[in-house]
Amino acid sequence: MQGGAAGAAPHRSRKYVNVSSCYALTGRKGMGLYDATKAGILAMTRTLAFEEVAHGVRVNAICPGSTLTDFHLSRGKAAGKSVATLKTERQTSSLLGRWATPQEIAWPILWLASDEASFITGAMLAVDGGLSIM
């Protein structure tokens, strides 16, 4: 994002949606560096929202929960776990009792970047199936 906002054409607004993690809000044992980095993304989002609003720039963040991606599938496969086992292991990691799909993470990003969210800036949207309130 460095330098991108200031170079925006004056007649066009820009929208940034940063991807953090629900663990930026909760933290976990043994994951301090990852969780702190994701919390830093939230601080950066709020700061940039303040700094860039005069340029017509909106900056928001989403905090996804566990998302069943190819990355997690390949890590599970390398550990000898089936997809069913992976899904079972994460059933308790959200109120909804399952992993998110990549599409369930993409839609809120698209919405925050759309004109329908034109009055939202500096916000954090938890897309975590309720994990952040557990």
What are these regions (language model features)?
Residues 21:
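Residue(s) in the substrate-gating loop at a strand-loop-helix junction
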Residues 27-35, 47, 75:
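Active-site loop-to-helix junction immediately N-terminal to the catalytic Tyr of the SDR YXXXK motif
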Residues 26-32, 54-55, 97, 115:
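Active-site loop immediately N-terminal to the catalytic Tyr-X3-Lys motif
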Residues 6, 50-54, 118:
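Alpha-helical segment proximal to the catalytic Tyr-Lys
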Residues 26, 98, 109-110, 121-134:
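Short C-terminal tail/terminal secondary-structure segment
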Residues 94-105:
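A conserved structural motif in NAD(P)-dependent oxidoreductases
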Residues 1, 37, 45:
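Active-site helix of classical SDR
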